[in-house]
């Protein structure tokens, strides 16, 4: 196997144009890690934040961008028993996926679901780990509950819509134009609201006979916070996973007390390897069968070559995409 590899470097950080191709050593898999020859890598908003210098990798993580990849296993670290060389896999990386090879802890690696391509498989880890841990583990979404997801046409949004419907929930989402409304309805949403032309809180209350929704998955923050409180039901849950608006805002907490609301949230990357392995096990048991049955499928908006990472980040930051933005490395 080659000793060097190409990867996307981003120097000290900045705008998308700072990214460029460079060469470095192929990482040696540490104990408990598998080395994957990357077929495709997913592009996620945390990649853009890291590139711009606003989201440094946690201690010990690869400084190379990229949090998810698919490909085949080419080497095993000491103590790896779950995988063998040649296995087709996808994985949640701690960093390093914008490269020809990436090392990932074995517990964060999953088989490519039967019937899915390597491209589709690379679009799974970041979104499915995020939605599973936040909507189902922390938010405790149940069948017959009503679920509101903001950013419904994003990769996370479309994943949340599909999974919530597969588990029997009613789904409402917010998006910014008619094309995105159509995409969300096609993914299974019961109602899609254009937040640019409608007051989503009023629309939600009207659609729920003034009862509100049981759970909200929010990645916007800012002035959405008060409106989220206003349209949650009694005993409702708000799960915050990102802030596209400022993270500091002013709210009236009376609604939280009167409705007995629960606020929670999480970030995925800093979680321990044990946490991520537990998430992976649950996904393999409860969600991978749905993927193999075609009940949930990733939506890929556009595929760029690894050398076109700048264009991929520009598209991500434009927020005009629907679904996942992907990078082709070896392909397949």
Each PLM stretch: what is its role?
Residues 2-5, 288, 293-302, 310-332:
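C-terminal capping/lid region of NAD(P)-dependent oxidoreductase domains
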Residues 18, 82, 88-151:
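NAD(P)H dinucleotide-binding glycine-rich loop of Rossmann-like/cofactor-binding domains
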Residues 25-42, 54-96:
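Glycine-rich beta-strand-centered segment in the early N-terminal region that forms part
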Residues 88, 146, 170, 236-237, ...:
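Short glycine-centered segments of the SAM/dcSAM-binding site in methyltransferase folds
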Residues 90, 148, 193, 216-217:
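N-terminal Rossmann-like NAD(P) cofactor-binding module of classical short-chain dehydrogenase/reductase
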Residues 122-124, 128-197:
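Mid-domain Rossmann-like dinucleotide-binding core that forms the NAD(H)/NADP(H) cofactor-binding site
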Residues 200-210:
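Short amphipathic alpha-helix with an adjacent loop that forms part of the alpha/beta core around
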């Amino acid at each position: 196997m080659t000793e060097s590899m190409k990867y996307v470097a981003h120097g000290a950080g900045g705008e998308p144009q700072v990214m460029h191709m460079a060469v470095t050593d192929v990482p040696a898999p540490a104990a408990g890690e598998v080395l994957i020859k990357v077929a495709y890598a997913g592009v996620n908003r945390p990649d853009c934040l890291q590139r711009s210098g606003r989201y440094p990798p946690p201690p010990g993580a690869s400084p190379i961008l990229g949090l998810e990849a698919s490909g085949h296993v080419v080497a095993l670290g000491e103590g790896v028993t779950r995988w063998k060389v040649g296995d087709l896999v996808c994985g949640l990386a701690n960093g390093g996926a914008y490269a020809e090879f990436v090392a990932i802890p074995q517990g964060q690696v999953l088989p490519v679901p039967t019937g899915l391509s390597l491209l589709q498989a690379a679009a799974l880890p970041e979104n499915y780990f995020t939605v599973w841990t936040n909507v189902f583990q922390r938010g405790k979404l149940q069948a017959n509950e009503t679920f509101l997801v903001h950013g419904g046409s994003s990769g996370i949004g479309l994943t949340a819509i599909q999974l919530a419907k597969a588990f029997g929930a009613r789904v409402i989402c917010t998006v910014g134009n008619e094309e995105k409304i159509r995409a969300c309805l096609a993914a299974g949403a019961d109602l899609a609201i254009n937040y640019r032309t409608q007051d989503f809180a009023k629309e939600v209350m009207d659609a729920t006979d003034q009862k509100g929704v049981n759970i909200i998955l929010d990645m916007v923050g800012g002035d959405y916070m008060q409106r989220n409180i206003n349209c949650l039901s009694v005993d409702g849950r708000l799960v915050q996973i990102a802030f596209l608006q400022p993270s500091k805002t002013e709210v009236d907490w009376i609604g939280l007390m009167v409705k007995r609301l629960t606020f929670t949230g999480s970030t995925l990357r800093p979680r321990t390897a044990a946490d991520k392995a537990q998430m992976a096990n649950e996904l393999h048991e409860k969600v991978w069968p749905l993927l193999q049955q075609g009940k949930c499928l990733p939506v890929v908006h556009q595929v760029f070559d690894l050398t076109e990472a700048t264009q991929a980040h520009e598209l991500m930051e434009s927020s005009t995409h629907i679904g996942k933005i992907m990078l082709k490395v070896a392909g397949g």
